[in-house]
Amino acid sequence: MKAVVFAYHDMGCTGIQALLDAGYDIAAIFTHPDNPGENHFFGSVARLAAEQGIPVWAPEDVNHPLWIERIREMKPDVLFSFYYRNLLGDEILNLAPKGAFNLHGSLLPKYRGRAPLNWVLVNGESETGVTLHRMVNRADAGDIVAQQAVAIGADDAALTLHRKLCAAATELLSRALPAILAGTTDERPQDHSQATYVGRRTPEDGRLDWELPAQTLHNLVRAVSDPWPGAFGYAGANKFIVWKSRVRHDLPAAKPGTVLSIAPLIVACQDGALEIVTGQTERGVYMQGAQLAQALGLVSGAVISSKPVVAIKRRTRVLILGVNGFIGNHLTERLLQDDNYEIYGLDIGSDAISRFLDCPRFHFVEGDISIHSEWIEYHIKKCDVVLPLVAIATPIEYTRNPLRVFELDFEENLKIIRDCVKYNKRIIFPSTSEVYGMCTDKNFDEDSSNLVVGPINKQRWIYSVSKQLLDRVIWAYGDKNGLKFTLFRPFNWMGPRLDNLNAARIGSSRAITQLILNLVEGSPIKLIEGGKQKRCFTDISDGIEALFRIIENKDGRCDGQIINIGNPDNEASIKELAEMLLACFERHPLRDRFPPFAGFREVESSDYYGKGYQDVEHRKPSIRNAKRCLNWEPKVEMEETVEHTLDFFLRTVELVDDKNP
């Protein structure tokens, strides 16, 4: 009978060997690549397959149509799963006419799910076992083919029980596999009303809570002892691991966590006490309990905890490249309002951040990211969070200097991304609403909207595509290399210090700054294609608060996320923005210092931006991810933002005029 096998771990090796011994023809084996973060004490399915001359694969998604088709071509009679970590879809299960069978490490229907071996010890069970059952589209719910019970001894820990289960699996399979081969199995349905479910365990689940009974903690120690990560506690700020313990009821009661003795090392619990027979400090070696007490500096009467009691707080170091820019200087101001952050910044100028230069938590170097690569790499290594905010982000430059846009926005930022991967640093990358391009969705969604750009001869898309490709590179590094990242997409942020009027004079600024320059100089406001394009304008204070919460990253909710940051309620056309700005200008107290309004003038985009430009009719964000990950919503109405922005620039002009009469 031809079999295709899905297997991992010692149980995988046990199952494969049993199939070979029973005379099955194994056409292929599917397994998992070893995780470098795991302690690989178990046998290698891949190595066993290679030694037996059996083809072996470890696909990321075995349920992908390409792999389904490959398995179909193998024409298996039967499928077996031995501790394979992923569920097999119906399309695979239906490929084998004799059915699909799974080996599970408990006496089903009890302990369906992940890590039953550890859970039975945690719960103090006296019996467990292994079950061979038919696979259905619900995990561990199919008819039972055979079971083998295993007694759990009082001295059993995770490894000894694991070995017992492997031996039981060998015995069970020696009976069941020939029956499957002969078609003589005696199967029975599970009683689903008796089913219990357990979930995946993590190292954090090994935390010792001294408020619990000593027997409960002893069971936990047994369940996660070596080669699993171990049960742990804290003496002050020092973490220690308990590998072996015993319950003591012969000492007087005391406050939970109190050290009752150091030789042997005994700690009071809610009910009884726990003797730590062997353990180790976090970076130490395996040792007896009395030596562990000495290494931790414990004395009788000391109190230990489940969490670090004394933790030296270090500020989060944030590296901001482009710190003098619009987002950079406002973000610096917000971070310095919180004592938890220390900022390292680099930019080619310092006019916008001069107000922070005397702050001891702000460290600034004037420089160019294309020149100061060694400084940047050193500070990426030194800091905790990296925000590469340097980019050319003004539309006229996309057609005027497309290669410079590519060199700075893509090539220089790619170096920074790779350094973050190299030093395992979290990157918060400024994507852009431009990546959505000419998307036709009513609201642009980070996870489902298509990213639509124009033809190659429309060079204005070089910015959008450069940013999109970096988004994809970062995503791939996160998926394949474990890079911690968040991508944020600003939607038309406005406020004080957005560009400057000198940049607007040469056309290298965002829309509102250009419009303010027209009012200040008394020149006509140019409306590209009539100013019908709609945007959603976001106050810089709202945007920065969202970005601050991304940096905070409470409970890791922003890891691996793409987050639009915009105000969908502040949607307006460029013409409506200009009219609102004009109304604010006319009632401003400094209005009489400036020339009369010169009117609106409609111009074609090719006349203003040059050939290669293509505009976008609307750009409205979905902020579902921002609400979910950040508990954030924008608050500032558009007119208030326009007033503040205009006031800042008009008073800047006033200061210049006062100095230069």
From Swiss-Prot:
Subunit structure and binding partners: Homohexamer, formed by a dimer of trimers.
Coiled-coil blocks: none
EC number(s) recorded for this UniProt protein: 2.1.2.13, 1.1.1.305
Region (Formyltransferase ArnAFT): 1-304
Keywords per UniProt: Antibiotic resistance, Lipid A biosynthesis, Lipid biosynthesis, Lipid metabolism, Lipopolysaccharide biosynthesis, Multifunctional enzyme, NAD, Oxidoreductase, Transferase
HAMAP family: ArnA
Residues annotated as the enzyme's active site: H104 (proton donor), E434 (proton acceptor), R619 (proton donor)
Recorded metabolic or biological pathway in which this protein acts: Nucleotide-sugar biosynthesis; UDP-4-deoxy-4-formamido-beta-L-arabinose biosynthesis; UDP-4-deoxy-4-formamido-beta-L-arabinose from UDP-alpha-D-glucuronate: step 1/3; Nucleotide-sugar biosynthesis; UDP-4-deoxy-4-formamido-beta-L-arabinose biosynthesis; UDP-4-deoxy-4-formamido-beta-L-arabinose from UDP-alpha-D-glucuronate: step 3/3; Bacterial outer membrane biogenesis; lipopolysaccharide biosynthesis
GO cellular component: membrane
Record InterPro entries: Arna-like_SDR_e, Bifun_polymyxin_resist_ArnA, Epimerase_deHydtase, Formyl_trans_C, Formyl_transf_N, Formyl_transf_N_sf, Formyl_transferase-like_C_sf, Lipid_A_modif_metabolic_enz
Annotated site (Raises pKa of active site His): D140
Gene name tied to this protein: arnA
GO terms, biological process: lipid A biosynthetic process; lipopolysaccharide biosynthetic process; response to antibiotic
Region entry Dehydrogenase ArnADH, spans: 314-661
Protein name per Swiss-Prot or TrEMBL: Bifunctional polymyxin resistance protein ArnA
GO MF assignments: carboxy-lyase activity; UDP-4-amino-4-deoxy-L-arabinose formyltransferase activity; UDP-glucuronate dehydrogenase activity
